Design a protein with these regions (language model features):
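Alpha/beta-hydrolase
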Residues: 221-311
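Alpha/beta-hydrolase active-site loop
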Residues: 132-179
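N-terminal cap/lid segment of alpha/beta-hydrolase-fold proteins
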Residues: 27-72
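Active-site nucleophile loop of the alpha/beta-hydrolase fold
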Residues: 212-221
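Alpha/beta-hydrolase fold nucleophile elbow
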Residues: 180-191
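Conserved alpha/beta-hydrolase "acid-adjacent" motif
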Residues: 317-323
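Short, surface-exposed "cap/lid" segments of acyl-processing enzymes
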Residues: 64-113, 123-126
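Catalytic histidine-centered segment of alpha/beta-hydrolase-like enzymes
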Residues: 344-355
């Protein structure tokens, strides 16, 4: 594994301020633009604290949206990813109608998705280029020929913290508000993106209009304050192989035709494309930072007033439906709806009932309702 220590981190500085446009022509002749933004941030990630990092944000927008003004204030949306999969893979799958970002863009929204530090196309701290910073178990699984002893880490702590994630999000939010000349945006988040987006919103309610949270990783046991050591000791990062994703997904299949192999293939291809270094490890993996978490507590949630739509997949075994029901019960917002989505796992946006999810999010973002309801629980797809 020593050879992996020689892999160099990409220089973030050369990316700052760059924007690349890729027009996409839809089947119906309606042109979409995909714009790649790299936003400079003074990092608070402990391994690179004080350095300038580049946060990647993908924009999907209808070309006809054109000139933006204050009248479009409720039409800017920021997607925030979960613990493992970067945002551009999570929410912009390049297969048929599975791009959540594209669905909202076609409805007239200016849609962005960001990668926090260590994910996807954002800056990856150099310690993430060393496979010795994986857990012992993941090192041995990755080692060609089956190594019998793990190597010693060069960085023996979690790579990021929830506070550094909030800092990244805040930098992007402020950039987008200024870029589009609006005072608020809405946020859509998945899994660990729940504590990231809703935790940020709780601190800055004036900047967030509405929330849509798929499988929000809420726990009533979350610590209110940071641990004694920040970041916590342990692996700096984790990896996922194609076989890992297959196994994790398949154990959450609860109905026939829940997902298509072609969708899986599109997701995995995009995953590997987002991580050219990880693609060279073993049979190819995606890397993600380990995050020290705290702060998004039941007290914070009970004080939150931001209108929130939350969704739980009936077969989710990563964030159990009971946790999302707890979140609904604890949330202080007067306008809140919980969707119980049939035939769905943790990966609901890549599955059979993805359009029910997308349609509900659109109604929430435009009207603040689901099936006309401002509050309550809705069962869809049964």
């Amino acid at each position: 594994m020593g050879k992996y220590r020689q892999i160099l981190a990409l220089a973030a500085g050369s990316l700052l301020g760059s924007t690349f446009a890729q027009p996409s022509l839809a089947d119906d002749g309606e042109r979409l633009l995909r714009l790649d933004h790299y936003i400079g941030v003074r990092s608070t990630v402990p391994a690179i604290a004080g350095q300038t990092a580049a946060i990647y944000a993908r924009e999907v927008v209808r070309a006809g949206t054109g000139l933006r003004n204050r009248a479009s204030a409720n039409r800017v949306v920021l997607f925030v990813h979960g613990a493992g999969t970067p945002a551009e893979v999570s929410f912009d799958v390049p297969y048929q109608d599975y791009s959540w970002m594209e669905y909202l863009a076609r409805a007239g929204f200016d849609v962005f998705a960001m990668d926090t530090t260590g994910y996807g196309r954002s800056t990856r701290p150099p310690a993430m280029n060393d496979p010795c910073n994986l857990s012992s178990e993941q090192q041995l699984a990755l080692a060609p020929g089956g190594a019998t002893e793990p190597c010693s880490p060069s960085y023996g702590q979690n790579m990021a913290t929830i506070a550094s994630d909030w800092h990244d999000i805040g930098t992007v939010v402020d950039h987008l508000l200024a870029l589009r000349n609006v005072s608020q945006l809405s946020m859509v988040a998945w899994s660990l993106g729940g504590p990231r987006a809703a935790g940020y919103s709780a601190q800055h309610p004036d900047k967030v209009q509405k929330l849509v949270l798929l499988a929000p990783a809420y726990s009533r046991d979350t610590a209110a304050t940071p641990p004694a050591q920040v970041p916590a000791k342990g692996p700096a990062m984790n990896i996922q192989s194609r076989a890992d994703l297959v196994a994790l997904w398949n154990r959450q299949v609860g109905c026939p035709g829940q997902y298509e192999q072609a969708v899986f293939d599109a997701v995995w291809s995009a995953m590997i494309e987002s991580d050219p270094v990880g693609a060279t490890w073993g049979t190819g993996v995606r890397r993600a930072p380990q995050v020290t978490n705290w702060g998004w507590t039941s007290e914070v949630v009970s004080a939150t007033r931001t209108p929130t739509l939350m969704v739980t997949g009936a077969h989710d075994k990563q964030v159990l439906p009971t946790r999302v029901h707890d979140f609904y019960a604890d949330l202080g917002a007067n306008r809140k709806v919980l969707i119980d989505l049939a035939c769905s796992s943790h990966n609901a946006m890549w599955e059979k009932n993805h359009l029910l999810l997308f349609q509900s999010s659109l109604e929430w973002l435009t009207k603040g309702t689901v099936n006309g309801m401002e509050t309550g629980t809705v069962r869809l797809g049964y």
